[in-house]
């Protein structure tokens, strides 16, 4: 599983989401990927 550090384009809000890939992480967090920038990805067990 991966940890993705993301920032919302409109507000600068930072968040962390988790998933098996980027699509899965956004789906699990119920976020629109078009509104966010992923700036770091780290593999976690």
Predicted regions and their residues:
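Short aromatic-glycine-(Arg/Gly/Cys) micro-motifs in beta-strand/loop hairpins
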Residues: 1-13
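Short, mixed-charge low-complexity intrinsically disordered segments
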Residues: 30-45
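A short, exposed loop/beta-hairpin motif centered on an aromatic-Gly-Thr core
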Residues: 11-21
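Amphipathic alpha-helical interaction segments
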Residues: 10-12, 28, 44
């Amino acid at each position: 599983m991966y940890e993705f550090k993301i920032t919302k384009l409109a507000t600068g809000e930072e968040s962390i989401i988790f998933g098996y890939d980027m699509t899965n992480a956004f789906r699990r967090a119920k976020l629109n990927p078009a509104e966010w920038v992923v700036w770091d990805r780290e593999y976690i067990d």
